[in-house]
Amino acid sequence: MAVIKMTDLDLKGKRVLLREDLNVPLKEGRITSDKRIRAALPSIRMAMEAGARVLIVSHLGRPVEGEFDEAFSLAPVAAHLSRELGRDVRLVKDYIDGVDVAEGDCVLCENVRFLKGEKKNTEELGRRLAALCDIFVMDAFGAAHRAQASTHAVARFAPVACAGPLLAAELDALERALDAPKHPLVGIIGGSKVSTKLTLLDNLSHRVDRLIVGGGIANNFIKAAGYEVGKSLYEPELVEEAARLMAAARAAGGEIPVPLDVVVGPELADGAPATVRKVSEVGPDEMILDIGPATATRYREILLAAGTIVWNGPVGAFEWEQFGAGTRALCEAVADSPAFSIAGGGDTVAAVEKYGVASRVGYISTGGGAFLEFLEGKELPAVAILQERAAQS
């Protein structure tokens, strides 16, 4: 992808505005997962070691725009960064008129959503943020699908606008998986509702060689194939759409395989009994909550023969142990496959971590919504503006 990269620039002595995604989950002021901070650390260290004067910018949560709210302060993030970097990382509340930072040092700017105009992507705020730096570095893939002042407008007006190492790695992995994949290309799409991933399913059904569907989404395809789904979650109005997608995949020389067997239960609850059924034998009072062992074996064969795997969403309700075997088997198959694999989305990342295969997945995306929108074939505004700036340089 034609963007300027931070790694290609001389940062020494330059004021670098580094947009990261440090939107971490908090409980009673404590960080419950530092995954996003850890993902950003290499870029922060790289900029500092290059002698840049680094101003780190991020959002956190959804405060009322333009108003300071202690509950959404980045103070816990500043403390965490200080520990990780082994130096005091100052949290600057009033930074919009400029901040003095020494070469090779960094400060953390307070939650950018406290500034009026951030969400509306105003030119005024974009210009003011751009005035803080010599180089703007967009490194927050998780926010790349949002056109906001700190991801988009600032890139229009900064003297130089480039992609940080984390964003560049995300784009390289996605391009490798979708634009120049080694075939067979296999997509795995799970989740509860077809309606939330219709664009994604439509886009991938024309591009992949095989599309494995799981979770509540699969129930629509099971129904479209002529089987009963009992009390399972499905969307009656989208069964015809599922049939169309299956036909479209076949017409393109691909396939959306329907499960051979499933795991059912009377309800989704702790202690609910789990029973394996042929897909043709689901009872009227049963819910499909996972794929069965024969299906897991079939999907494993498909994944081991793949050249590229793109994965978004589990195939069962893996949060409940008795309905997690299918997702576990899928995790292990992706990990064992010689294919280049990319996984993204909160539930998917949680699954690969739960089953201990994260280190054997080719690339784990840090973006939820951005990952999904890229797979849907949509333009990511924060990336598009970097491409535009690169074309002008």
UniProtKB/Swiss-Prot annotation:
GO cellular component, one term: cytosol
Location of this chain's protein in the cell: Cytoplasm
Family annotation (PROSITE patterns): PGLYCERATE_KINASE
Keywords of this entry: ATP-binding, Cytoplasm, Glycolysis, Kinase, Nucleotide-binding, Transferase
Major enzyme class: transferase
Position of the signal peptide: none
Ranges in a coiled coil: none
Similarity comment: Belongs to the phosphoglycerate kinase family.
Protein name per the record: Phosphoglycerate kinase
Lineage: Bacteria, Pseudomonadati, Thermodesulfobacteriota, Desulfovibrionia, Desulfovibrionales
